[in-house]
Amino acid sequence: MKVFINPGHHPGIDSGAVNPTYGTKECDVVKEAGEMLADYLTNAGCEVKIMQDDNLDMVCATSNEWGADLFISLHCNACNGHNARGTETWYKSFNGQRLANYIQSQIIRSTNTIDRGVKQSDGLW
């Protein structure tokens, strides 16, 4: 299986969400998570390609040209409110729902965060 991983945002262009207290940048967190995921999937026998860039047209084209069976984009949400906590996993197509449920359950079990659920959107890349 060929898995394409896109850690969202690029440090030199748009770092994504930034923690106002600690300065932690989304681009750094998802890059590290993407590299960990790539190692895990490679050890499980998958072919993995990882690309961190803000140009989603190029990222998606590269994934399609490579012939990826699966496209995973990693992000960390942020908001101004202090009550928002937890993890959610999004998927686009019906075929992605099963994987999204599995990913969500593994994250919740591993990190003990609040489960915000699995959500579907047709507006995803």
Residue ranges and their predicted role:
Residues 1-23:
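Short glycine-rich His-centered loop
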